[in-house]
Regions:
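Conserved, structured core segments of small domains
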Residues: 1-117
Length: 117
């Protein structure tokens, strides 16, 4: 079955102290529901970003912050496995309501590992 990434977006000035107990409870309830349905493969919040870029001289430069400058950043991700894109969107819709943030859904295309010799 296909896997999907659900990425939740937060404003770049997000203050975690604004999360109330009701919202945290709804997020935990949704995670329990996903686990019970057998669709959740991973879920977690994300810390600060660091960007690495190759330089013309072959070196790699590391900078603080996300690669793209934007007013929003990815605050958390969930990986789910569903039979159809519509089913993934239905779970994402529940995520929008529980987390109170916009989300993006993308199918994950797995690259096969190297053949064992």
């Amino acid at each position: 079955m296909p896997h999907y990434l659900i990425a939740g977006y937060l404003p770049d000035n997000f203050d975690p102290s604004t999360q109330d107990d009701a919202m945290v409870g709804e997020i935990h309830a949704l995670n329990r529901e996903m686990i019970a349905a057998g669709v959740r493969r991973f879920a977690g919040g994300l810390g600060a970003a660091h960007t690495l870029r190759a330089q013309p001289d072959g070196d790699v430069r590391i900078t603080d912050g996300p690669y793209l400058e934007t007013k929003e950043l990815v605050g958390g991700i969930t990986i789910i496995e569903t039979a159809t894109p519509d089913e993934a969107l239905a779970w994402a819709r529940k995520g929008v309501k529980a987390c109170r943030m916009p989300v993006e859904v993308r199918e994950i295309f797995f690259v096969p590992g190297p053949e064992k010799t």
